[in-house]
Amino acid sequence: DGFDGAQFNVGNDKVQFQAAYGYAVEGAVEGKNQKENNTFTYASIKGDLNKHVNLGGFYARNNKHKSDNTDFKNLYGFSTDVNFDKVWVGGEYVKGAGMNKGTAWTAGIGYGAYDQAKKGTWDVKAQYFNFGQYMGAVSSTWDIAYDFSQTDATGTNNNFKGFKGWLATANYALQDNVGLTAYYGFNNKTNKATGTNDKLSNYYRVDLN
C-alpha cells in the first residue's frame, strides 16, 4: 500500500528486515487528512528456514491511538509458506493486542507450478479465511470480496469486519507472459462473537494479465 514516511530495508538472499515510520495513504485511511491519520511504526522480518520453508513476522503500532477491546493499538502477526515440489501449504495469523475477537488467520493448500512467463503452466489453491468480529482485511494479498472497504450486512457500515469463508483460485498461462486467473469465494458468513451469523453471497472474478 501507499506509504508516506521513512523506511529502512536490509537483507540478503536468505533474510530480509524492514522498518518504517510514517503515514499510510491508501486502504483503510484513504481520503483522511494528516490530523485524522495517525502515524504508524512498523517492523518486519522474513527469511528462508531452508529450501522448503519460509517464515515471517511483523509488529505494527498505531501511534497516538487509544485502543479498546474493539480496536487495536499494537498489532502483530506471523506467516509461513512451505513448498515441496509442486505442493504448497501456507498460512498467516494476526492479533490485535488487547482486543476481544481481535484475531485473524488464513490457511491454504495448493498444487501446481504456475509461471506466467511459461505457456501451459498452472496451479490451483484452496484457502480458508477467518477474521474475528473486530478484524477486517485491508488491501489483502488475496482477492476476497468481503474486505474492510465493503459495507456490512446491514448496509450502514462501510468498514466491514468479521468474516469467514473459502476462496478457490486457479492460474493458467495462456501464452508466454499472458496469464488467466479465476477466483471463486463460497460458504461465506459473518463472524460475530455472539448471535447468529449471516450468510453472505458467493462471488467470482476472472483476471487476464
Language-model segments: which ranges?
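Short, solvent-exposed loop/turn segments at secondary-structure boundaries
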Residues: 1, 30-35, 68-70, 194-196
